[in-house]
Structure formats: C-alpha cells, structure tokens
Design a protein with these regions (language model features):
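Bacterial Sec-dependent N-terminal signal peptides
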Residues: 1-16
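Hydrophobic alpha-helical bundle signature of multipass membrane enzymes
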Residues: 16-191, 204, 212-222, 228-232
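Short acidic/histidine-rich active-site segments
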Residues: 192-201
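Residue-level detector of functionally pivotal "anchor" positions at catalytic/ligand-binding pockets or at interdomain
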Residues: 235-257
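Acidic surface patches and DE-rich sequence motifs
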Residues: 255, 264, 270-271
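C-terminal tail/sorting-segment detector
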Residues: 268-278
Length: 278
C-alpha cells in the first residue's frame, strides 16, 4: 500500500508544474471513495463487458493512425504536450507563453482535480488489463503502471476534465472538444492500461471535480480571463457578450400598446396613473 501511494505521489508531483497551488486542497474536494461504486466483480456482466472492450481495444491497434494517437494520448508529465492533443478541437494551441491565462487556468484546475483519484485507486487496487493478461503495452508504460491501481483511470479523469474546462472556455466548439476527449479516454482501453469501466467511472469523477470548481471565486475569475483571452486570440465573439445583449433586449420596457418605451408610440399609455391618448 505504501508503494502504491509513493508511485502516485511521484506522478502527481510531475503533473503539477512548479508546485502549483490548487484552487482547493484535496480534503476540500468531493471524496470519490464515498461516491463511486466498487469496480465490477469478476463474475459480473459489467466485467464481461470489460473483457469484450479489451478485445475491441486490441483490434483498434491494427489501425496505425488510431494506435499512434493512443500512444500520444499516454503522455502524462508534460502538460503542454497533453494540451496539444486538443489543439484542433479547441482551435488554439495552449502554452504558457502563447496563452498564459488559459494555461494558468488549466494547470491550476488539474492540480486540483488530478489528486482526487488517489484514495480510490489505493483502496481498490484493481488489476490492470495488461497485468491480468500478461500482455505488453504499445505505449510502453508497463514499468510505470504495474502495481498501481486501475480504478479509476487518472488519464481519463484528466482528459475528460480538460474537455469540460475547454468547453466552458469555448462552448461554441463543445462538440469537437468532447469528441476529442471521448477518444482520448478510450485510448486508455486501446493501449491496455485500463478497463472500460475504469474509463467510464473517470468521466463521472471528472464531472464531479469540475462542478466543485464552479464554486471557487479564484477559478471563476481566472475562467473569465481565459474566456477573454480565447476570444482575443481566435477573433471569435465572446458568447457571454452575446448572451448579455440578449438579456438586455429581453429586458426592454414597453408601452401598453406594445411599442418599446424608447420609440415613439401612438394610442393609449399610462402616465401618472392615468390613461393618456397620444
């Protein structure tokens, strides 16, 4: 158990550049161990589906392009490379120098949500697919992952979390962003790092962490900066401005005859509590 925690601590430190201060400490975040069910038992229909999906993943490796993508999705340490996997979907490359506000938001948010997996992983210590089948991984992660719990998937929790954050920054590209995030999570099945149920649980876990962030004032402030930076960098209209204009239009005052108060009206209006004909 100590070894497992030590391995996860190393991975967590690598993922958090320069010891980023998270929006919330881990003990302030929802406890997945109290929320998520146990992973499927070996004799359950859910685990039977895991076996089927493991076979599906191995079939996907026959597609060289998909396999190459799955291997690239395995990156963990370099967040700039991780973010690069969403470049086309997001419509913008994320980097510390090129998009400092977006980068700060993403790194700090992940420093907050990534550690959520640790307690549940250690508690269930689920055997990984490549371990159970004594298989090799095309992403060559065996030495790093062997002995570390499979449930939930850290990559999938992070990947779906990234998708949620990017879709909040650029909701007009949500379809592309979530499509990329879905495939990113499934890459963990393809390389044999995780069972499908690990991945599915992690999407839910990421959503839980994402919701928790919405109540943090520092996160809200940084999200607004990230949204403004995205609008500036891409030349797109800030959707918040569009919505504000729509609210302003819907809040206009009208005369009794139905004409806007800021336009000339004709007919009967109410003035000082009395009817008046214009």
């Amino acid at each position: 158990m100590i070894v497992v925690f030590a391995m996860m601590t190393v991975m967590n430190v690598k993922a958090q550049d320069n010891n980023v201060q998270p929006y919330y400490e881990l003990d302030q975040m929802p406890k997945l161990i109290e929320i998520m069910p146990a992973p499927p038992a070996f004799d359950s229909p859910e685990f039977a589906n895991d076996i089927v999906r493991y076979g599906w993943g191995k079939q996907q490796r026959e597609d060289e392009e998909r396999l190459e993508l799955a291997i690239a999705d395995a990156e963990w340490d370099d967040l700039t490379k991780v973010f690069l996997q969403w470049k086309d979907a997001f419509g913008l490359e994320i980097s510390e120098m090129g998009t400092p506000e977006i980068y700060k938001l993403m790194v700090t948010a992940l420093a907050t949500t990534d550690p959520m997996r640790k307690e549940t992983k250690a508690y269930y210590h689920r055997e990984r697919p490549f371990e159970r089948f004594n298989d090799t991984m095309p992403s060559h992660e065996e030495d790093d992952l062997r002995g570390e719990g499979s449930y939930p998937s850290g990559h999938s929790l992070r990947g779906w979390g990234i998708s949620l954050l990017l879709a909040q920054i650029a909701p007009q590209r949500a379809s592309e962003i979530f499509s990329r995030g879905w495939d990113y999570c499934n890459s963990r099945v393809i390389v044999g790092a995780h069972w499908q149920s690990d991945v599915d649980a992690s999407r839910t876990a990421a959503s839980i962490g994402f919701c928790a962030l919405q109540g943090n004032e520092a996160f809200i402030t940084q999200m607004k900066k990230a949204q403004a930076e995205y609008a500036e960098k891409t030349g797109t209209t800030d959707v918040r401005e569009v919505r504000a204009q729509a609210r302003q239009q819907s809040a206009r005052i009208f005369h009794i005859d139905g004409t806007p108060a800021d336009e000339n009206s004709h007919g009967v209006v109410i003035e000082n509590g009395k009817k008046k004909v214009q």
